[in-house]
Amino acid sequence: MSNLSYHEQIDRENILKLRGLVRDLPPFCSDFFRGIEPRTSSRTRIAYAYDLHVFFDFLHRENPMLSKLEIRNISLEHLDQLSVTDFEEYMEYLKYRCNDKKQEVMNKERGI
């Protein structure tokens, strides 16, 4: 491991972090991350994983159809059933929410 450059060490740490994040998402998300791997940095993929976690957490907490499912059990078929209203509610949710650490998160229009 000591033969790795600084950037290689950071990339390795990011890859391990991403694996942990993807493990908590629905299985089909793994295909997405494998697909974007050649054209994105590990830090970009981590940011996408956080964004997907926020989205699926919203569905799990706020959507009556999906609230009884664990996040890992949400399927593409479930996503196909979402309406425009569901996405509008998600966009509104992004303006103010509490994260997993019970910290308040506020986004302005530019951050959504």
Predicted features along the sequence, with ranges:
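N-terminal core-binding DNA-recognition domain of tyrosine recombinases/integrases
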Residues: C29-R43, H53-I112
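N-terminal helical hairpins
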Residues: M1-L18
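A detector for short, charged/polar N-terminal pre-domain segments
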Residues: R19-R23
